[in-house]
Structure formats: structure tokens, C-alpha cells
Amino acid sequence: MNIAVVGLSHKTAPVEIREKLSIPEPQTESAIAQLTSYPHIDEVAILSTCNRLEIYIVAGETDHGIREVTQFLSEHSKLPVHSLRQHLFVLLHEDAVMHIMRVAAGLDSLVLGEGQILAQVKNTHKLGQQYNGIKTILNRLFKQALTAGKRVRTETSIGTGAVSISSAAVELAQIKAENLAACRVTILGAGKMSRLLVQHLVSKGATQISIVNRSRERAQELAKQFSEHPIRTHLLPEMMTVIAESHLVFTSTSATEPILDRAKLEMVLAPNQPLMLFDISVPRNVHTDVNELANVQAFNVDDLKAVVAQNYESRRKMAQEAERLLEEEIEAFDIWWRSLETVSTISSLRSKIETIREQELEKALSRLGSEFGDKHQEVIEALTRGIVNKILHDPMVQLRAQQDVEARRRCMQTLQMLFNLDVGEQFS
């Protein structure tokens, strides 16, 4: 059995490709069901964010498992395999383990050290368990990755003052608009990213903010979190009217198709009316054809790289400190992983000795006859079970604790030969 990850990110694919492969949370259950239906995939977890899609698997035959994931991604995105491959990365076992640790710690993010990814990894773990994709191995891996991510944030300073996608978008808006206080700002959506947008806009001096959302309750709930600021809320049918009165529009909704395009804007904007759109959603909320309109500028998550680069160099040295912590968590997972290959030998040995115990106990009880009371039988049952457990305890502890791979394998082979054990598949 081996761990592998197949994926793409802001490093390997532009947003127009990433949005085709995005798996929104409502589609996670069916995606996991389809992936686990393939013959070579035993476990699966799906991490889908605006900047990455990564599918983690446990497979007996790694090459076959990777091919099955690639086929799934091709069908899901409706992109042929040959054009998809140029954007995909594939990492096997040690590299896959290192990767999820770095992802959880924010070291692989567009915004180095950003904190939102840890919550996204946690949600991936939760959904994987909920929909029966995650079992023993990925459960342990994701728990270790979450521990790594938390340690990096509490034991290093990399998360202090880290920019996020939302703050980078506001930073870009400030560069383009110069004076946010003079701008009428509209935010489409009322989720976590929108909350961060409001937070950063307010800190940069924005005072005229409107929130447009499908649910009035969610929009009002968000506005209440910033009750000291006069934030207006609107429902979706009012969206175009509100946009027509705006200077800046930020989009952060879960829509899977563009909700703004040239035709919609042409209907409400005056000729040559300036408007800047900042789309931090994947899939994108803003169609590329809006750039054909005079005085309309649209920016997406890939346009944030220049803003993020200013922050990167100062955080790179902090990342080196974080990498040392990750090595400790990787080693802890590796020790656990290597102990897995002892499981089949230990299980087989315990099963064989338990069978002998039961057979010999049955013989003894039959000789003692029916007059031998139940209470005495329970005592003898407990006695024999205790003897077996005590005899097996030290050999099993020593076998699991043996960190030298070759020495441990020699011990297992000796046990298998001496006790004539029939063991199943070994972990590699």
C-alpha cells in the first residue's frame, strides 16, 4: 500500500484551468464515491480551494491508482488527459506526506503562511471521514498534518501579519483606487472570504460598503459583525442596481458559473463609467468578456501574485524555521507508517495462539465435565487469556519499536517461520 497525491495548484495551472477542476463541497460526496469505486483506490481525500485541487489516495498498485485519478479528473473537467497532464503534479509516499504537511502549514500557499488553508485541510479530513473516503492511513496522515499546521502557527511567527487572498485583493484595490474612503464598495457573497474582505476594507479606511447575498439573514449577520460601520445589505435581485452605483466590486460566491458578464454590465453602466472588479472566486464569478468594456477592469486571483510577492521575502526566513518543525511531524508519521508492516504478522500470531488457547481450553473443560460451574469456567478463561497476553506483550512491543527497517523485517520473518504464520499483504 502506498500514499500518492495527484493535483494542480496556482503553481502549475492558471485560474481558467483550476476552475474547470474545482470540486465544490456539495459535489464531494459523489466524487469520493466515484473515486473509491475504482478497483485500485482504497482511500481518498479531496482538497479543493481557490488555488488548488489535490486528491490524496491510498493504493495497492500506485501506478493504477494514479491513472484512475487522472481519468476521473479528465471526466470531471471534460479536458482530455493529454492536455490535463501538463498541469498536474504527482507525488508519491514520502513526497506526498511532506506535501500535505507543507500545505497545512501554509508553506505551499500563494500567500506564504496564510491561515485559512488549515481550516480547509481540517474540512477535507472531516468530509473524507463523513463520506467514507478516509480510513486508517489517510486518517493518521491528515491528523498529523493538522498537528503540523497548528504547531507552525503557534511555535513560529510565520502566521503573524500574514496576508490572505482577501487582504491581497484589498491591497490591490488600494493600489488601483488610491483612496478607498472615497469609493463605493460592493461585496458579492457573505461567507468567510467576504468577512475577511470587510475586515480589511474597513482597516484601509473604506466607509461605503454594501453586501449583496442570496440570503438576507447571512448578509445581515455579516454586517452585524462590523456594527460600528454603516454596512448596507441587499438581496441578489438588487445586485445589478447596486453594482451600477459602485466604484469597486469584490466577488466571493460559491457560484459555479460567472454571475457577471459584459451583457449584464452594459445594461446598467453609463457609457465609459469606470468600474473595477476583483474576483477572488474559483470557479470565477466574473466572465473575461467584461474587459472588453471601456473603463471596466477585472482582476482575478492570479493577478494577486505581484501584491503577494512584496510580502514573500520577509516571510521566507520564517518558513525555514517552520520546515524544521515539519520534519518532526513527518518523522512521527513515518514511524507509525513503518510499524504498519508489523500488523499482519502480529495479527496472524495472535490469531494462531488464540485458536490454540480456545482449543486447549475446550478440551480441558470437556474433561472436567458438566458439573464444573460457570464461575470456574470464567476464572480459567481469564487465566488462559492473561497468560497469552503476557507472553505476547514483550515480543509485540519490541517488534513495533524496532526502527531499523531491515532488523524489523528479519524479526518478522523469523516469527513467521517459527510459528508457520500465514500473513497477508505487507505495507511497502
Swiss-Prot record:
It comes from the Bacteria. The keyword Oxidoreductase applies. Its EC number is 1.2.1.70. InterPro entries: 4pyrrol_synth_GluRdtase, 4pyrrol_synth_GluRdtase_dimer, 4pyrrol_synth_GluRdtase_N, GluRdtase_CS, GluRdtase_dimer_dom_sf, GluRdtase_N_sf, NAD(P)-bd_dom_sf, Shikm_DH/Glu-tRNA_Rdtase. NADP(+) binds at residues 189-194. Substrate binds at residues 49-52, 109, 114-116, 120. GO terms for biological process: chlorophyll biosynthetic process; protoporphyrinogen IX biosynthetic process. It is an enzyme of class 1 (oxidoreductase). Pathway: Porphyrin-containing compound metabolism; protoporphyrin-IX biosynthesis; 5-aminolevulinate from L-glutamyl-tRNA(Glu): step 1/2; Porphyrin-containing compound metabolism; chlorophyll biosynthesis. Keywords: Chlorophyll biosynthesis, NADP, Oxidoreductase, Porphyrin biosynthesis. SUPFAM superfamilies: Glutamyl tRNA-reductase catalytic, N-terminal domain (SSF69742), Glutamyl tRNA-reductase dimerization domain (SSF69075), NAD(P)-binding Rossmann-fold domains (SSF51735). The active site is at 50 (nucleophile). GO terms for molecular function: glutamyl-tRNA reductase activity; NADP binding. The record marks 99 as: Important for activity. It catalyses: (S)-4-amino-5-oxopentanoate + tRNA(Glu) + NADP(+) = L-glutamyl-tRNA(Glu) + NADPH + H(+). Catalyzes the NADPH-dependent reduction of glutamyl-tRNA(Glu) to glutamate 1-semialdehyde (GSA). Possesses an unusual extended V-shaped dimeric structure with each monomer consisting of three distinct domains arranged along a curved 'spinal' alpha-helix. The N-terminal catalytic domain specifically recognizes the glutamate moiety of the substrate. The second domain is the NADPH-binding domain, and the third C-terminal domain is responsible for dimerization. Belongs to the glutamyl-tRNA reductase family. Homodimer. During catalysis, the active site Cys acts as a nucleophile attacking the alpha-carbonyl group of tRNA-bound glutamate with the formation of a thioester intermediate between enzyme and glutamate, and the concomitant release of tRNA(Glu). The thioester intermediate is finally reduced by direct hydride transfer from NADPH, to form the product GSA. This is Glutamyl-tRNA reductase. It comes from Trichormus variabilis (strain ATCC 29413 / PCC 7937) (Anabaena variabilis). The gene is hemA.
